[in-house]
Amino acid sequence: MAGANEIDMVISVGKFLQGNYEEVFEEIQEIKLSCRDAKLKVILEAGLYPTPQDLYRACILAMEAGADYIKTSTGKDAVASLYNAYVMCRAIVDFHEKTGVKVGFKAAGGIVTTQDALLYLTIVKGVLGEEWVNTTDFRIGASRLANNILSAVTKEEVKYF
């Protein structure tokens, strides 16, 4: 297979918060169609939503439009919190129960220590269940965590990622 296996896109948070839901939905849907066989990961920028309800609705909209994964953040803006991860996982559960479609979850931004990673794992296990705890359905984007682990193992400062 030539080309990308996955495509990342960032949801238009501003358009969503202005109530332009149809426009955001269509944008995600168009990108999904362009992906062909590649998986679409929609980055929510979870730290930018004023309420948990807004974040939840954005997750549902992204999944209904065709997201194969939803991701907390790029790490460039306000990073997601553990509570945001919980809200996103609840949205995945509700969507799965309604449609039978299994959507993956990726936590990213601000995950620096193994303790941070374990907290996200605990949320995924507790909310989504054991069947989501695999490399396909649950991921952690944590370049600083990787550097910290490599530094601890090699006993030298590593800034590889």
Where are these regions (language model features)?
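Short donor-sugar binding/catalytic loops of nucleotide-sugar-dependent glycosyltransferases
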Residues: I111
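Terminal helix/beta-alpha structural elements that buttress the NAD(P)+-binding lobe
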Residues: A108
